[in-house]
Amino acid sequence: MKRILCLTLFVVLFGAPAIAATNKAKQSGSTGTGEIGFGVGQSDVNSDTAGIDSAQYIGIRGGYHLNNQWQIEGQLSSSSDSGDISGTSVDTTMRLLMVNGVMNFHPKKKELVPYVMAGIGRADVSVDAAGTSASDNSVAYQIGGGTRVFFGKSKTMAFRADLSLLRDSSFDDSTTLTTVTAGITWKLGGR
């Protein structure tokens, strides 16, 4: 019940500015556009129960620009690695499904777009060791920041790099992942 209340509060607090931003964008004549991309990276895992201390990351993201500054983004990603706990081989995989609110900044250099983001979603964790497997899921929270560097004549493709901190509590243990990612993103629509 506590998680549902927190999720509802999060949606209300971040939903109101997003709706207001959309109405302002409609009045000013700017239209919403999309963005899609992928990234790869490395996660530093802070957990005693996962059996690993780092993991490889791969993910895809898709977003909708409410206006020039605000964006709603969906993220689907997976981190996995193998490690040893007391001589037993352990394979750990974490799959994430997140919804992020992104605030973009637009300095004078138009090809550079730094951003900060915060998100909430679901973490599914599975651990396989010595023929035995266990899985759990939990609510996950994420904050981060990074930049997009647009290139090419039309400036619709960008290199994206970011740093994020993700927290979940699967297997009754709080885990923090610090992830550095790099990837490519494309603008969709007439922005």
Per-region residue spans from a language model:
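Solvent-exposed loop/turn segments connecting transmembrane beta-strands
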Residues: 46-53, 86-91, 131, 169-177
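Outer-membrane beta-barrel biogenesis signature
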Residues: 5-38, 189-191
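A generic hydrophobic-segment detector
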Residues: 129-182
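A short, flexible beta-alpha/helix-coil linker loop
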Residues: 43-45, 123, 166-168
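Gram-negative (and chloroplast) outer-membrane scaffold detector with strong preference
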Residues: 21-25, 42, 56, 63-130, ...
